[in-house]
């Protein structure tokens, strides 16, 4: 088992013929992902990377039976791309694009909830179930099928956790980058709930960062509902207050959202926290005895 995606997931790409869509679709195909086509308005009826191109998501879904879409569309047009995917009946949307206006995301979030559609992102690396399906921009070769579920607000820090779990021989069930924006399609709790139910996942690594209250909310959820061991790390311990650190959501505002507060919340919930990414492997060794 795994969560969200597996070897049978049929995937289309929106923004398929652009440079990002092309490069990452090539990588996904090489990894073994079941890419079945792509969407670029005006280029319908052509082929790209040996796959059919469609003008609309609805046409792509009708022709291919795709259930997942990955979006590499410039930020100003992303809202329409997501709404189009929802309207076409796509059940899993993975939005890689960074810089989508917050107001656009408010509209999108309402529509996602109304339609019961799961979205990962925006501003995220995507989702990978090692050895089966890779949707996003992750380096496939560092992953290894296994028993640790990883959920993170950061892309590159996810890869650090992956490398450690691979090097220590644990491997990963599924890795989910939920993204670094203030309004994500899915939050920590959504993914923790899935990992808790997934029989393949024996432990969870959760990587948070300063800003917002997502980690504190996740800690409260873990305390009540998660029986599997969780290893937690928070990025931004030395971040100055009021300065945005890379991600739009990574800012300590009004004295709230500091790394220390988040570490304290996780520790109070029984999470095994580490103060350095380099300690994740060792921490997992202690909780997976």
Swiss-Prot record:
| Residues spanning the signal sequence | none
The answer to whether UniProt assigns keyword Nucleotide-binding to this entry is yes
Q: Which residues cross the membrane?
A: none
Q: What is its pathway?
A: Carbohydrate metabolism; tricarboxylic acid cycle; succinate from succinyl-CoA (ligase route): step 1/1
What is this enzyme's class at the first EC digit? ligase
Gene3D superfamilies for the chain = NAD(P)-binding Rossmann-like Domain, Succinyl-CoA synthetase domains
- This enzyme's EC code(s): 6.2.1.5
Q: Which InterPro entries match?
A: Cit_synth/succinyl-CoA_lig_AS, Citrt_syn/SCS-alpha_CS, CoA-bd, CoA_lig_alpha, NAD(P)-bd_dom_sf, SUCC_ACL_C, Succinyl-CoA_synth-like
Binding of substrate: at which residues? 159
Tell me a GO biological process for this protein: tricarboxylic acid cycle
An example Gene Ontology CC term for this record: cytosol
Activity regulation per the record?
Exhibits two interesting properties: 'substrate synergism', in which the enzyme is most active for the catalysis of its partial reactions only when all the substrate-binding sites are occupied, and 'catalytic cooperativity' between alternating active sites in the tetramer, whereby the interaction of substrates (particularly ATP) at one site is needed to promote catalysis at the other.
* Active site residues per record: 247 (tele-phosphohistidine intermediate)
Quote the record's binding site residues for CoA: 17-20, 43, 96-98
Q: Which UniProt keywords apply?
A: Ligase, Nucleotide-binding, Tricarboxylic acid cycle
Oligomeric state and interaction partners are given as: Heterotetramer of two alpha and two beta subunits.
Concerning its family, UniProt says: Belongs to the succinate/malate CoA ligase alpha subunit family.
What does the UniProt record say this protein does?
Succinyl-CoA synthetase functions in the citric acid cycle (TCA), coupling the hydrolysis of succinyl-CoA to the synthesis of either ATP or GTP and thus represents the only step of substrate-level phosphorylation in the TCA. The alpha subunit of the enzyme binds the substrates coenzyme A and phosphate, while succinate binding and nucleotide specificity is provided by the beta subunit. Can use either ATP or GTP, but prefers ATP.
Record NCBIfam families: PRK05678.1, sucCoAalpha
* Record protein name field: Succinate--CoA ligase [ADP-forming] subunit alpha
